[in-house]
Each structure stands twice: as C-alpha cells, then as structure tokens.
Regions:
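Membrane-proximal helix-turn-helix segments that form the acceptor-binding/catalytic region
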Residues: 31, 85, 137-154
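Short alpha-helical donor nucleotide-sugar binding micro-motif in glycosyltransferases
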Residues: 252, 259-264
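Glycosyltransferase donor-sugar binding loop
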Residues: 197, 220-234, 250
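Nucleotide-activated donor-binding/catalytic signature segment of Leloir-type glycosyltransferases, i.e.
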Residues: 234-252
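An aromatic- and histidine-rich active-site surface loop
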Residues: 96-115, 123
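Short hydrophobic beta-strand element within catalytic cores of glycosyltransferases
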Residues: 289-293
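Conserved acidic donor-binding segment of nucleotide-sugar-dependent glycosyltransferases
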Residues: 304-315, 323-328
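Aromatic "clamp/platform" in nucleotide-sugar-dependent glycosyltransferases that forms part
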Residues: 272
C-alpha cells in the first residue's frame, strides 16, 4: 500500500533536527511512517519547505518538499497548492493521511476526485472534534469539520475520542500511539521533582505550572517550553526566571528529551485539552508519576494508579504535588503504575497493524 502523510515537520523528526522541537502529532507521524515502511509499505512524508532537500529517503521513508503550506500565512498557503498538487500527482498515493487539525484537510478533500486518492484524518487533540477548534476559528473550523465528516476514513487515538466521533455520527478506528525507541538506557537517579514539557500555547496553560512551582518552593522544578505563541512565551520566560526553585529550558530536540523524563519524579500536565499526550508515554518509559490538572485519556490515571488527577482545581494540583512528594510509597506506586501503562497499552507492531486495518 502507498501512503502519503501530509505533515509540516514530521520529516525533521527523522532527520533528528537540532533546531525544531517537534509537536506530538509530528513525532507520531514519523514513528508511524517508519513502522509502516519497515513492514514493506511505500511511505511518503510530504513536508513543509524549511530548506530541506527533496526526495531524501530517511529510515526507509521518502520525504518530499511540498512547499510553504505550513506557515499559517494564507497567501503562502494558497501559493503552495500547485506544489502540493505536483507532489500528489508524482507520488500517486492510495491514501493521504493527515494527523491533527489543519485547514489543508478541506483542500485535500477537494482534490480527491481529481487526483484519485483516499483521505484519512487521524485525530490528535480532543478539541479537534469536540467543537472547540470551530469555536476558536469559525471559518477554517467549519471547513475543517466538513472535511473530517467527509473523509474516507478516520482514526482516534483514545476510546474517548472514538465515542465523540460516534456521538457525532461518524466512525473511527481506534488505535494507540507508538513508542519512540530509547536511544540510551534509563538513568537510575531522579534529580527533579516536578517536570513540565510542552510548546508554549494557550491551551497548555504554562503559567499554571509556574503557580505550582511558587506554591511548592521546596520542590525542584524544571520547565521545558519551546516558543510558539511569542507573547505568551515571553511572559512565561520572564516570570520563570524569577522563581528560584525552577529551571527554565527553551527547547530540547525530541531525540534527546527522554533523559529529562528519566530524571523527574513527577510529570505535570496543565492543559485544557489533549488527545493522548506523548509526554505521558515518555513519562511512563521513565517510570515517572503523573500529576494532571485536567487531562486523563481513557481514565488511565485511575486505571493504572499512575498519579493524581486534580479535576481542574489548582488547589488539588498543589495538594497532589505535596502529597506525592511527601509520601514515597504513594509516589513509587504511581511511578510503577505509569510504567505498567506503557507495557499494557503500547506495542508498536500491534498498534501499527490496527492503524492499517482502518485503511482497508
């Protein structure tokens, strides 16, 4: 089967790019593309133009430069359409897969009859299908939702998302995210109490982690926060540098990030919405407990006793941090529980085959 993944920066994950800190969907596209290529499928990633060479093969995956479709600039997006069409005509994929929200899903849907491919949408964030994206972006959001509904196939990454699709009259194949193989053995010691990792976006609510660090001054805190929303990032960085028990790090490439999870006792999530965070997976690989303000995909925190869910209550988040850090037996149980989640839920071969079943 020939599959083309339409993804702005997934090719940079395969390149092990030092400058770009990839988002979760980009990482998962790269991992899935590599697994599928290993199974003998013809896999292409059509990536945004960041100066990379065209037709480079990385880990068995052909990468194509599809122009500046990724910049967020409407004029550049429209100008990139001829190049995207050229790549699609040259590659002639059976399936085009889009993971995560983008107005390009509508454009690709419109191109389907002329170029002969089938279109799959894989949901990355819950907000892509629960109406939040449309409320934030009324025009592009409506086009995006129309395209989601009219795709030839859909995938969810949690059973919660599968239920949302079903409640909105759509079917979706439920598969779980893939694991990024470790490049180094897990370190023995844990020198950080509370770790927060995410790109700087409003929905990640980074200032709430700063509130937590200030509220628990005895905790050794670390924040890895690459810039995306510049104004928000500048306010976060300025404030973070005034907190004595917090180390602020601007960016860490994905192929180096696991060591930071390894060194942490507890991973903290303050987001309003996620899908299945890659950070939860990496925390599980590290034997790191979870402290989540709101996000709990498929009820995993209670199911595996992998940490504490605060019910979107900052007082409970602070209490949860203090409780786990003061009770070694509870912390150890949560760390073991999160590691067990990885063992029971995440198998690359199994989940890759489930993904493929959704394209039949």
């Amino acid at each position: 089967m020939k599959i083309l993944f339409f993804s702005s920066f997934a090719h940079l994950v395969l390149q092990k790019n030092q400058e770009r800190t990839s988002g979760g969907a980009e990482l998962q596209v790269a991992l899935l593309a590599r697994e599928l290529a290993g199974l003998g499928h013809d896999i292409v990633i059509a990536g945004g133009d960041v100066g990379q060479a065209d037709r480079r093969i990385l880990d068995g995956v052909l990468t194509r430069n599809a122009g500046k479709f990724h910049t967020g600039n409407l004029l550049e997006m429209l100008s990139a359409i001829p190049r995207v069409v050229q790549v699609l005509r040259e590659e002639r994929p059976e399936w085009v897969v889009v993971m995560g929200w983008t107005a390009w899903l509508f454009i690709l849907w419109a191109l389907r009859p002329f170029l002969g491919f089938k279109l799959d949408f894989t949901c990355s964030l819950d907000s892509e299908i629960n109406g939040e994206y449309r409320r934030e972006h009324p025009v592009f959001g409506r086009l995006f939702e129309f395209a989601v509904r009219h795709c030839d196939a859909r995938h969810s990454i949690t059973s919660d998302q599968e239920k949302v699709f079903r409640n909105r009259g759509m079917t979706a194949t439920f598969y779980r995210y893939l694991l990024m193989p470790r490049s180094t053995p897990r370190s023995a010691g844990k020198s950080v109490d509370l770790l927060w990792v995410s790109r700087c976006q409003q929905l990640k609510r980074p200032h709430l982690f700063l509130d937590l660090a200030e509220a628990v001054p005895s905790a050794r805190c670390q924040m890895i926060c690459p810039c995306e929303d510049l104004a928000l990032w500048e306010s976060v960085k300025k404030r973070a540098l005034t907190i004595s028990n917090l180390e602020f790090i601007e960016r860490v490439p994905y192929h180096q990030i696991q060591e930071y999870y390894d060194a942490a006792q507890i991973f903290v999530n303050t987001s309003t919405y996620e899908g299945f965070p890659n950070s939860f997976i990496q925390a599980g690989l590290a034997g790191t407990a979870l402290l989540s303000l709101r996000v709990d995909p498929d009820g995993m925190i209670g199911l595996f006793h992998s940490g504490i869910l605060a019910g979107d209550d900052m007082k409970e988040l602070i209490k949860g941090a203090e409780t786990m850090l003061s009770r070694p037996e509870l912390l150890d149980e949560a760390q073991q529980g999160n590691a067990r989640m990885v063992d029971e839920w995440l198998d690359n071969e199994r989940n890759t085959h489930i993904f493929l079943e959704g394209l039949t």
